[in-house]
Every structure is written in C-alpha cells, then in structure tokens.
C-alpha cells in the first residue's frame, strides 16, 4: 500500500516501515561514527526498547559497545491492510541491522509490568546471554496493571497543589490559546506514581537478582526529564515530577538492596526531545519549537541518539561521570545552560500565532514528530507501494 501520515491531535495513527528503518539506520551510523566505547557493557537488557531513548540506548549498547541485547516492548505488527506501530518497525530494522553486523539480539513483545515478562526474559538470559551488566529501564506508559492484585492504574498529566495556566499550541490548527490544567487529586498523584514511578524498575532488578542473572558491578539506569522554569509547573512540580521523584527513591533502594553485588543504580536526566510521550504533554510542543530554534542557532541541538552516546561515554562508562547532588547523571546541561534558557524565555514571550513559523522552529518540531512514525525522512520514496506486514522474530 501507499502509506501517508494520518495525524489526529498529538498522535499519528499509522507508520511507514521504510521511513522507520531509515531512522534506525541513521542512528546506527551516527553511533558507529563515534568509535567503539571503551569498557562498555557486554550483555544488556532494555526494558522499553522500541522508540525514543530506549531504542537509542539499545543502538549504543549494540553498535557502540558490541553488546548482546535483549529488548522488551509493547508494539503492534502490521497486517496486509493496516500498518504496524512505529516501534514495531524500529525493532524490526534494528534486528535486521544487528544480524547483518553479527550481533546477538532477541526481542520480546508484551506487558513489561507483568511477572510473565520478567520470568520469560530471565529464561532467555540464562539460556543464551550470560550475566547482565547493564539494565536500561525506559518505559513510557499511560497505564499499568499491578501484577499481583490485577488493579489497573492510570497516569495523569496535571500540576500539583494548584491549577496552572499557560499558553499552549494546538499542533493541528496552529492556534495558540491559554490552557488551564486543574490540580491533581491525591488519588491521581498516587496512581501516576504507580504507573510512572520506580516500583516496576525495582521489581525487575529484584527478579533479575533473585534469578542470579546480574553480573558483579552491574549498572542500571532509568530516564527522566526535569526541565526549567517554563516546563517546571507541568513537569517537575506536577504528577509526572512526583513519579520521577519516586525513581530517585527506587535508585537508592536498588543500590542498597543489591550492594553485595556492587550494583549501581542511577536516574539519568536527559534533554527535552520530541517523542510520542512528550508530544502528548501540554506546553511541550511550543517549548520544543522555541528550544530547537535556540539550540540549533548555537550549535548544541541534540536528539535521542546524540544524548545516549554522551550518556554512555560521559556518565555510565566514564571515570568522572557528571552527577548532581541527587546522584543523577546529567546530560541535559546544554539545554539548561543560562544562555539557552534565556533565549527560550525571550522567544516564549514573543511567540504568537502570526509569527510562530517565523521566530520558532515549529517546522523542525513537526518534522521530528512525523519522523517518529517514519514520515518525511530523507531518501524514502513515499509514493512507493510498500508491504506494511514486516517480519520480526519474537521470543515466544
């Protein structure tokens, strides 16, 4: 079929297999161009491996370090009449490239929050991998089913304490309006922590430790975004911020529970990028449009793959990692530089519907958003008839 983007609000409901493959290939080539990472991991588990920072982590582990990788994700394959999800096509492209490069790689599609996923992953690790020396936890999910009680928790994106009003860009109509987000209830905060906090990260590490599949000195990392003044009320001082604070708690708990194996657990603070998760957050499309304009102008703009290569070389596998006082790796330092933030704040005050395309980089934002789903990628023929049903071998 000929596949053109179908966008509804902040979601694109289809994906292009060849565009997704080209994106993955570009990230692989960027990583290879950086050269081999010294003292990198050998056996890596990536929980949430199909898009964004999780996918980039897996690419750096495999193509930057030569590691075996086991990737978990929750994606839909294509059929003859319907496209699969972008994440499915990303993993299929990664798998093909890994095989071509002679890298061991296996994939699991399912609910990473379940006990079943954990035991299945452990079986694969025991049978085929050797002990794990890096666990990447990179899940972005709106819901989580408690594996014991069966209760389903849902996350919300709301400020904490008081309502928050800010300008917001409707990415369909290009209208800029004031949007008010009501404050979250205690119950909504608790549910968001259950979904997006550190509990499942702990459960993964406990299950892996109990099965004795973690190497001595294994590292584990989970990702967060903190942001600055503009995004703080909807990120840092909001339900999502409360959940991310719980990641800090979990990191400390993991390191202390498994100290006999010298396990290190850190949260890594990464920069704002366009992902399927961030495009759903009010304020972020407009903030990102301003941020890209400023960072591109001063030559510091980075996407997921640039960020992850730096996380590995400057933090995870560095003798002098960049840590803050909460023991978090920081790779957001370019975004948070006073110069960049001042530039973004100035633009934020000036942006209107009339000058949006002129003074911000909304076009760049849009291009990145469509690119997530494999559209608008250089070198891809979008008039070509393509098969949406792409093969990918999965762990049964």
Curated annotation (Swiss-Prot):
Entries under PANTHER family matching the protein: ENOYL-[ACYL-CARRIER-PROTEIN] REDUCTASE [NADH]
Active site: 235
Originating gene: fabV
Pathway: Lipid metabolism; fatty acid biosynthesis
Molecular function, one GO term: trans-2-enoyl-CoA reductase (NADH) activity
Residues bound to NAD(+): 48-53, 74-75, 111-112, 139-140, 244, 273-275
Protein name: Enoyl-[acyl-carrier-protein] reductase [NADH]
Keyword Lipid biosynthesis appears in the UniProt entry: yes
Reactions catalysed according to its record: a 2,3-saturated acyl-[ACP] + NAD(+) = a (2E)-enoyl-[ACP] + NADH + H(+)
Binding site for substrate: 225
EC number: 1.3.1.9
Site (Plays an important role in discriminating NADH against NADPH): 75
GO biological process, one term: fatty acid biosynthetic process
Organism: Teredinibacter turnerae (strain ATCC 39867 / T7901)
Function comment: Involved in the final reduction of the elongation cycle of fatty acid synthesis (FAS II). Catalyzes the reduction of a carbon-carbon double bond in an enoyl moiety that is covalently linked to an acyl carrier protein (ACP).
Superkingdom of the organism of origin: Bacteria
Assembly behavior: Monomer.
Family to which the UniProt record says this protein belongs: Belongs to the TER reductase family.
Annotated HAMAP family: FabV_reductase
Keywords on record: Fatty acid biosynthesis, Fatty acid metabolism, Lipid biosynthesis, Lipid metabolism, NAD, Oxidoreductase
């Amino acid at each position: 079929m000929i596949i053109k983007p179908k966008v509804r609000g902040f979601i694109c409901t289809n994906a292009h297999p060849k565009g997704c493959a080209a994106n993955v290939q570009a990230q692989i080539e960027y990583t290879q161009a950086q050269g081999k990472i010294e003292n990198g991991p050998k056996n890596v588990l990536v929980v949430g491996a199909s898009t964004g920072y999780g996918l980039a982590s897996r690419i750096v582990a495999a193509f930057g370090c030569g590691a075996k990788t086991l990737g978990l994700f929750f994606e839909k394959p294509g059929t003859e009449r319907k496209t699969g999800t972008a994440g499915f096509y990303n993993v299929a492209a990664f798998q093909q490239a890994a095989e071509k490069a002679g890298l061991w790689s296996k994939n699991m599609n399912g609910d990473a929050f379940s006990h079943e996923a954990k035991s299945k992953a452990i079986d694969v690790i025991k049978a085929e991998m050797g002990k794990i020396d890096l666990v990447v936890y990179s899940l972005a999910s709106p819901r989580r089913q408690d594996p014991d009680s069966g209760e389903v928790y849902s996350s919300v994106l709301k400020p904490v304490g008081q309502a928050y009003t800010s300008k917001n860009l409707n990415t369909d109509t290009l209208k800029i309006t004031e949007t008010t987000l009501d404050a979250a209830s205690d119950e909504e905060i608790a549910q968001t922590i259950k979904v997006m906090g550190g509990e499942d990260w702990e459960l993964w590490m406990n299950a892996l430790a109990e099965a004795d599949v973690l190497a001595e000195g294994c590292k584990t990392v989970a990702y967060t975004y903190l942001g600055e003044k503009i995004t703080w009320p909807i990120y840092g001082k909001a339900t999502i911020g409360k959940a991310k604070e719980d990641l800090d708690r979990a990191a400390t708990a993991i390191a202390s529970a498994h100290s006999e194996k010298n396990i290190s657990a850190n949260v890594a603070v990464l920069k704002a990028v366009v992902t399927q998760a961030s495009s759903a957050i009010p304020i972020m499309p407009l903030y990102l449009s301003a941020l890209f304009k400023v960072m591109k102008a001063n030559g510091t703009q980075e996407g997921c793959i640039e960020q992850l290569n730096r996380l590995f070389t400057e933090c995870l596998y560095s003798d002098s990692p960049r840590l803050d006082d909460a023991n978090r790796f920081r790779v957001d330092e370019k975004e948070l530089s006073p110069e960049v933030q001042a530039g973004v704040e100035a633009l934020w005050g000036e942006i209107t519907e009339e000058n949006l395309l002129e003074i911000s980089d909304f076009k760049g934002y849009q291009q990145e958003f469509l690119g997530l789903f494999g559209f608008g990628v250089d070198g891809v023929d979008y008039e070509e008839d393509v098969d949406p049903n792409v093969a990918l071998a999965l762990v049964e």
